[in-house]
C-alpha cells in the first residue's frame, strides 16, 4: 500500500477542486477497465464541496456503471437536511444520471429502530457484496472517521456495518461502515481541512491510536490536506 499526501492546498475550496479533478480522472480510468465502480461518499462541508465540484466533471462519463455508497449516515428522518444522502443528492446525484438502483442510501428512522435498520442494511450489503474502489472520508478533530469515534463501542451488525447509539456528536444515533468494510477498499482518500484538525492529522501521521489511523486502502491511501490542516506536520 502506498500513501500520497497533498498538503499545500490553500483552503477547503482549492482542496475540493483538486480532489474532485483527481476523482473524475480516477473514475474515468476505472470505468475503462471494469464493468462497474463502487464509490463510497462522505458528508461534511468539504466532502459535499467535492461532490459539487465533481458533478460537471463526470457528466460525460458512463455514470450508469457507478454504484454509490456512504461511509456513514445520521439516523434521522429520510428527508432531513442532516442526512449525508440528502446533501449528496443536492450536490451531485440530482445532476448526473446515476440510476436510482445504483444509489445505496443507508436507512432512516422510517425503516425501524436503529438496530433493525442497521441489520436490514447489513443484509443488503451481504447479498451484494460490494468491492469498494474508492472510499472518501473526512476526519474529525478527535480523529474519528465515518461514525467510528475514539473510545466508542458501537453495536456490530454483521462484519461490514455498525450502529452507534450514543455518538459524541449530534445526532446520537448513526449507522456506519465498519473498519473491516472501510479497509476492504482499494483506495481510501481523506479530505481534511482546517486548523482545528491539525493536531489530529499530526497524531495520525505519528501512528497514534485514533480511528483514522486504523483505516487505509489496500492499494493507495491519499490525503488531501489544506495548509491549515497540515500545519502541525513536522515532515
Regions found by a protein language model. Name each.
Residues 182-235:
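C-terminal functional extensions of proteins
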Residues 134-137, 141-180:
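Class I SAM-dependent methyltransferase SAM-binding "motif I" and its flanking Rossmann-like core
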Residues 2-3, 64-134:
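Ligand-binding beta-strand-loop-alpha-helix segment within the catalytic cores
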Residues 28-57:
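Glycine-rich N-terminal segment of FAD-binding domains in flavoprotein oxidoreductases
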Residues 1-39, 115:
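N-terminal glycine-/serine-/threonine-rich phosphate-binding loop
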Residues 116, 146-151, 200-204, 235:
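A short secondary-structure junction signal
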Residues 53-62, 86, 90, 150-159:
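A glycine- and small-aliphatic-rich helix-loop capping segment at beta-alpha/alpha-beta transitions
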Residues 41-46, 137-141, 193:
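Glycine-rich beta-strand-to-loop/alpha-helix junction loops that act as flexible
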Amino acid at each position: 500500500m502506498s500513501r500520497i499526501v497533498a498538503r499545500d492546498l490553500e483552503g477547503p475550496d482549492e482542496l475540493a477542486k483538486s480532489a474532485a479533478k483527481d476523482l473524475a480522472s480516477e473514475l474515468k480510468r476505472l470505468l475503462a477497465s471494469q464493468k462497474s465502480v463502487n464509490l463510497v461518499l462522505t458528508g461534511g462541508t468539504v466532502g459535499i464541496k467535492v461532490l459539487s465540484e465533481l458533478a460537471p466533471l463526470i457528466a460525460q462519463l458512463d455514470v450508469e456503471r457507478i454504484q454509490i455508497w456512504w461511509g456513514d449516515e445520521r439516523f434521522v428522518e429520510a428527508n432531513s437536511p442532516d442526512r449525508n444522502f440528502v446533501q449528496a443528492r443536492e450536490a451531485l446525484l440530482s445532476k448526473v444520471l446515476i440510476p436510482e438502483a445504483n444509489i445505496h442510501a443507508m436507512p432512516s428512522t422510517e425503516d425501524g429502530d436503529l438496530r433493525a435498520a442497521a441489520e436490514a442494511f447489513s443484509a443488503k450489503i451481504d447479498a451484494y457484496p460490494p468491492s469498494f474502489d474508492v472510499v472518501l472520508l473526512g476526519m474529525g478533530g478527535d480523529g474519528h472517521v465515518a461514525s467510528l469515534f475514539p473510545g466508542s463501542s458501537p453495536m456490530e451488525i454483521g462484519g461490514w456495518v455498525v450502529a452507534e447509539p450514543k455518538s459524541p456528536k449530534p445526532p446520537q444515533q448513526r449507522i456506519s461502515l465498519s473498519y473491516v468494510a472501510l479497509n476492504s477498499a482499494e483506495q481510501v482518500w481523506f479530505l481534511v481541512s482546517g486548523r482545528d484538525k491539525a493536531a489530529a492529522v499530526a497524531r495520525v501521521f505519528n501512528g497514534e491510536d485514533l480511528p483514522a489511523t486504523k483505516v487505509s486502502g489496500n492499494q493507495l491511501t491519499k490525503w488531501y490536506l489544506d495548509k491549515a490542516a497540515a500545519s502541525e506536520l513536522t515532515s
